[in-house]
Amino acid sequence: MVVKQQKDASKPAHFFHQVIVIALVLFVSKIIESFMPIPMPGSVIGLVLLFVLLCTGAVKLGEVEKVGTTLTNNIGLLFVPAGISVVNSLGVISQAPFLIIGLIIVSTILLLICTGYVTQIIMKVTSRSKGDKVTKKIKIEEAQAHD
């Protein structure tokens, strides 16, 4: 009697297979980048694409988890080229340091404000869709306190 082994979906894929999956996602994202009318980095498109593939189940977590963890653990090494390009651009930075610092501060504040608003919107939408009992209870208590 021959027993066929079924491939377990939760079993992690071979490391090389995981590298191929991530490389294909990056390749497709670079193709998408070349057709985009606005400049957007291929790596950002790849992150969104991989997220969508994971959410839809087209790619299983086990197919990218080990390589993804390895890349995340060594992310400092991946920023070395960006750091070197900043050092090479010190001449440009030294021409308008206050402008650059101001832009960094303003963009950080805008990012925090936008993140807060988006978080509030998401929390409202999810509480409405689930019919959150805690939210209803708080609203009832607030209404009684005002009466």
Swiss-Prot record:
Transmembrane as a keyword of this entry, yes or no, is: yes
List all membrane-crossing ranges.
12-32, 35-55, 74-94, 98-118
Q: What Gene Ontology cellular-component terms does the record carry?
A: plasma membrane
The residues the entry assigns to the signal sequence are none
Q: Which domain of life is it from?
A: Bacteria
In the record, biological process GO terms are: cytolysis; killing of cells of another organism; programmed cell death
Q: Where in the cell is it found?
A: Cell membrane
Q: Where does it primarily localize?
A: membrane
Write out the entry's keywords from A to Z: Cell membrane, Cytolysis, Membrane, Transmembrane, Transmembrane helix
Q: How does it sit in the membrane?
A: Multi-pass membrane protein
Role noted for this protein: Inhibits the expression or activity of extracellular murein hydrolases by interacting, possibly with LrgB, with the holin-like proteins CidA and/or CidB. The LrgAB and CidAB proteins may affect the proton motive force of the membrane. May be involved in programmed cell death (PCD), possibly triggering PCD in response to antibiotics and environmental stresses.
Homology family: Belongs to the CidA/LrgA family. LrgA subfamily.
Protein known as = Antiholin-like protein LrgA
Q: Which organism is it from?
A: Staphylococcus aureus (strain MSSA476)
Q: What is the lineage of its organism?
A: Bacteria, Bacillati, Bacillota, Bacilli, Bacillales
